[in-house]
Amino acid sequence: MIDGISPMLPAAGGPVAGVPREWIPNASPRPWRCIVIHHSATPSGGAAAFDKMHRAKGWDELGYHFVIGNGTDTRDGQIEVGPRWPKQKWGAHAKTADNRYNDYGIGICLVGNFDVDRPTAAQMRSLSKLVAYLMRTYHIPADRVLGHGDTKPTDCPGHHMSVAAVRRMAAQVLADSGAPVEPGSQAAAIERS
C-alpha cells in the first residue's frame, strides 16, 4: 500500500481498495514509460479551464492526464483526472518529432506559474503520492519522472519546480509503503515500440 493506495491497477475498470475510483482506467492500460510534469504557467485554473483552452487550440480535449489544483478553481492539492486517463488515451502535452512523450508519457499539470511562485505544499504532497502510485503501478523508474523541459527546450515546469525533489518525495512515499524503488534506466532510453 502507498499511504492507503493499493499499488496495482486491474487491466481494465473495476474497483480497487484504497484507490480513488477515477484513477482506475476504463480501458486496458497503455505501455506507459515515463511521467512528464508541467506547470500551467497561469496563476489560476483547473482541468475544465485548461480543457476549454486546449479545445480552443483545435485539440480534441484536455491534453494532460491529471491536473493538481492550487486552491483557485479547485481545492489546493486536489487531483483532477482528465478525460484521457480513463480511456488510456495518449497525451497531448509534450510534443516531440517522434511524439514518444505523448505516446508513452503520463502528463501531470500543476496549476501555477513556477517561474514566479513555488508549488504549494499541498500540491507537492499530492504530486508525490500520485507519482509514487504511477511509478509502482506502471513500473516507471525514478529517472523517467521528467519535467517538460527534459523532453524539449522549454522553461516548463518552471524554475521553482524541482523534479529531483518530486523524485525524492515519491521515493519516500514508496519506501514508507515498503514498495521497492526501481533503479534508474536513463530517460533518454525511452524507445518507441
Located regions from the model:
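Short, solvent-exposed loop/turn and secondary-structure capping segments
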Residues: 47-49, 78, 91, 121
